Amino acid sequence: LAVPGDLGNQLEAKLDKPTVVHYLCSKKTDSYFTLWLNLELLLPVIIDCWIDNIRLIYNRTSKTTEPPDGVDVKVPGFGQTFSLEFLDPSKRSVGTYFYTLVQSLVDWGYQRDKDIRGAPYDWRKAPNENGDYFVALRKMIELMYEQNGGPVVLIAHSMGNMYTLYFLNRQTQDWKDKYIKDYVSLGAPWGGVAKTLRVLASGDNNRIPVISSLKIRDQQRSAVSTNWMLPYNYTWPADKIFVSTPTANYTLQDYQKFYKDINFEDGWLMRQDTEPLVYQMTPPGVRMHCLFGTGVETPDSFYYEAFPDKEPKIYYSDGDGTVNLQSALQCQKWVNMQKQDVMLLELSGNEHIEMLSNATTISYVKKLLFDL
């Protein structure tokens, strides 16, 4: 059962909007269309429509988020793998995600949507707003157990690991002993990632040249999950400076001021709502395999000459290009904290997304599944 990361599965939307931000934007659609990932929606001008549709609006009273008026977003294909194999339904290579891993399983005799399934979710939100997802996830694991006659192997990537940990922490040990055989964690950001501060301050176009970082920033800020991924104090020193400007330094003790200074105070509320969700870092209570990339330059801190609207100078440290090594190594602490085995495997030179299709990863999964 595959659990994707942030941005890691398709989202669909249907519109019936009172107003639009640009005359080129659709106001009403008869059916659902692909909101993520559809490269055509990210072109100049059209991207304004996309941002207005995919953003979330934070409600300070209910502490939850809602879509803009007249936008209905759904997650296609729960229980299936298509929406995480290719993020772009046209199967363009740019959106290839879980495909290589799933196809390898199929080559070994597994069947898509039968004994290999996907658990996509609305990755814009944190687990506190995705309660129905966890109910469905539990039911699906039980169903897979019944249909296939044995416990399930979970494979999660990136933020999907935070979701998986949250889920496992809420199941009884008896349930986990019965239904979960192994848990493979790929590129898990257990302690948050330094890159998040840049995403919130000035945006990050993920190296997609047609997109301006400042444009996409509003969408990235509005996703609760971005704020959930800020570095945590159980991983990083309290005095580490993540962001510096000519007039201020920001450590993880300065988030409230950081949000005020970037003029996004809702973010501080979102962070407070989500910080406790896996803060205890309770071990998962199942046999675990932590695979993590090293040896790739990973953003570690940022210097802004003009804060926050200009791109920063980036300082790097070790990791997989996204997840800093110290965040990935949380797994080590669990080795002596649970009776089930915790195995760590360093993937040297493995980038955050590429590790999913890396030969080492795939052969590790194969050995695990076939007890080789």
Residue ranges and their predicted role:
Residues S222-A306:
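Glycine-rich, aromatic-lined ligand/substrate-binding cores of catalytic
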Residues L1-I155, M159-Q220, D239, S244, ...:
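N-terminal non-catalytic accessory region
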Residues S301-S317:
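Short, surface-exposed loop/helix-turn segments at secondary-structure junctions
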Residues G109-Q111, E146, M281, F302, ...:
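A short acidic-Thr-Gly-centered motif at the start of a beta-strand
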